[in-house]
């Protein structure tokens, strides 16, 4: 059924089909119809960040930026749902067109630029949702906020999202906000992590609960840079790392229509690059911090490969666009079929 729907949706522009799909998933959630597609999603409980996940396969941020279809996505069988990226103030993002499909490569290039309705709007939608499962809220900075003041934007979003999130993801790796990726390195990263950790402690006291913080990183780092990031995350006491965001590389899409468009590349071509980052992180973190793997999962076995590389959870986005809800069950089943390691 999804193959037919995809054929129809792919006749529309990528952003139009994205918006229509979000509307349909949201409507299905309100009517309770999406469970007909996701009812067979397996249970494979896992405890990560002190949270109990019904299965380790989640929706990556970016598909539902404003929390418009939380209930709908949850009913499809995801073990957790991450919404955003959201910024303190609403912003329109980059000019259209800004999403491009590369179906021959099972890939997408986007340069959305954190288009969203603002954190206050997102919080109101979370409050209106019926979903009580694991919800991540992904936060970023406004386009016109100078990088040297980015910490302020993250703290504003953290303050407002904290009480409504199971965990909060700090996005310092989108390639579509100028200067953002510089926050992954050196003193900029250290200062950001210190500020977030301190505010997390304050909010824990204020709300009587500790909400874990995850940092989402890029796939375009060297091994040496990845090792330094891992050390900074451990030192600051962050709770998890998400590996990875989209890539600036065009390996695997050379010569394809739209392959040279500006923006972040996601889908199958980023898989090996992202999985390599997971492996490097796993070696450095040595179990001290969980890894959430995202990037290039288009078949169930790819999810299992991420777990084998050292991840505790996985997320899908582009693969969901190309394969539909069936990919959720396939990914859970593939992980469940993995050989058990002695503890």
Curated annotation (Swiss-Prot):
Binds 1 FMN per subunit. FMN binds at residues 61-65, 85, 138, 171, 216, 244, 267, 296, 317-318. The gene is pyrD. This is Dihydroorotate dehydrogenase (quinone). One of its GO terms (molecular function) is dihydroorotate dehydrogenase (quinone) activity. It comes from the Bacteria. Pfam families: DHO_dh (PF01180). Catalyzes the conversion of dihydroorotate to orotate with quinone as electron acceptor. The lineage of its organism: Bacteria, Pseudomonadati, Pseudomonadota, Gammaproteobacteria, Pseudomonadales. Signal peptide: none annotated. Pathway: Pyrimidine metabolism; UMP biosynthesis via de novo pathway; orotate from (S)-dihydroorotate (quinone route): step 1/1.
